[in-house]
Amino acid sequence: MDDMDKEAVELGGQAKFFSDYKVPDPEFPNDRNKDKVIEFSKYAWDKLMHPKVTASEMLTLYSEAIAGMEKNPNIPQLFRDIFKNTYLPIRDPETLKLFLKTIGEFEYTHSEKLGDAFEYLLSVMGSQGDAGQFRTPRHIIDFLVAIIDPDKTDTILDPACGTAGFLISAYKHILLKYSKDNKQGLNIYEYNKFEKKPFNNLGDQLMPDDRKKLIQNFVGYDISPDMVRLSLVNLYLHGFNTPNIHQYDTLSSKDRWNESFDVVLANPPFMSPKGGIRPHKKFTIGSNRSEVLFVDYIAEHLNPNGKAGIIVPEGIIFQSGTAYKDLRKMLVENHLYAVVSLPAGVFNPYSGVKTSILLMDKEIAKKREEILFIKIDNDGYNLGAQRTAVKGGQLEEAIKIIHDFVAVGTLYATSPKIETAIAHLVPKAEIAKNGDFNLSGERYKSQITISSDFPIVELKEVAEVISGQSPKSEFYNETGEG
């Protein structure tokens, strides 16, 4: 790990961040000669990692440094915010020493690797539930981002950003679009499937000013100060020097209601607190359920040509309550163009909840008379606790089907018939027919009709089913053939 203070001194400058500073003496607040000196230089990385510092001393120094970080005026505000009210959870000196030694092997120029390492730590935390809510699997984030396909001029929001996974994936997806080596036009889902990345230098076709403007386009809200802190760190490690992450109650506060965006990506909390949410009066749908309010919020905060992808629990799809039906009616009539059903177990091992993805685009929704339904049975991983990779994943096929549907949707109200193993189209009129606007795709799937004079029966009624053994000689005919 580079010690920037040490490098500054070696180049003839002065230590800036981990340097001693003065604060007024409470008894003599107006007498600068009596200011107290706070010794912060002893916490500099070079001194902390000195070979003569024991593990116990390191634990003490590191704990003191974290506790004093937010008070040091020499530390940039971003980091003071990150370390506000934090503490060191590691109490074993040798464990901390090993951890810091590993971190010390990174260089500042390795920010991408450091960011990837941090995201790995977040995934481990998520599987253990340490951060208070489970996280969206990386491949599902990338899948959703690849579908929405944000570009460099889009303003992008995650209204329940957690650790900023959607924002970082969208950022990398955009960089890929402007990478010289990306001759295949890989999207972020395809790129991240490679264990060894096919190329680096993402975004090398963007000018420095373009990158600065791009970074300012990303915005995240979260009600949890811990999640905000994790987002700030994660984004900083991915090149965001001043991330636009705000501790904000998306559903109860009106302060940012008038903001709108070109792209919204989200996996908001599914659970409502006891007694429900107490939202303000600006929502179109009257409800105290968080999943209803978040979908309403996203739909209402898209720009006229905006598009969104949101992961929702099954209640949004078919619940019969008035608020759920009103929400689905609003979506079908004004916002929704596709529904992707995900298999139960996508969020294993920390939740077996069944979810779907709602895809919104006002422009397409106004032109289309149909909604596209896709059912994913295989997301590329088994549905056990460990979620190991398996063959036959359907996500890439789904991306292609959706993109083809969107391309046609900008020109025509209806499409050539789509009826594949995983996708089919349903007229909006059929969805609206019984008034509940149910978004379960299987409900509208064409039933196979068989023209035959013979009744359909189970195989075991007309044949003996033998399994689990090798054929015996009596099963063969006179010629010895089966």
Q: For each predicted feature, which ranges?
A:
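Conserved nucleotide-binding/hydrolysis micro-motifs of P-loop NTPases
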Residues: 163, 252, 269-272, 314-317, ...
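Conserved hydrophobic/aromatic beta-strand scaffold that supports enzyme active sites
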Residues: 355-359, 373, 436
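Long recognition/docking surfaces used for binding and targeting
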Residues: 5-125
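Short, intrinsically disordered, charge-balanced linker/junction segments flanking boundaries
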Residues: 374, 392-405, 472-482
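Conserved S-adenosyl-L-methionine
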Residues: 130-266, 271-273, 279-282, 288, ...
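Conserved Class I SAM-dependent methyltransferase catalytic core
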Residues: 223, 228, 288-360
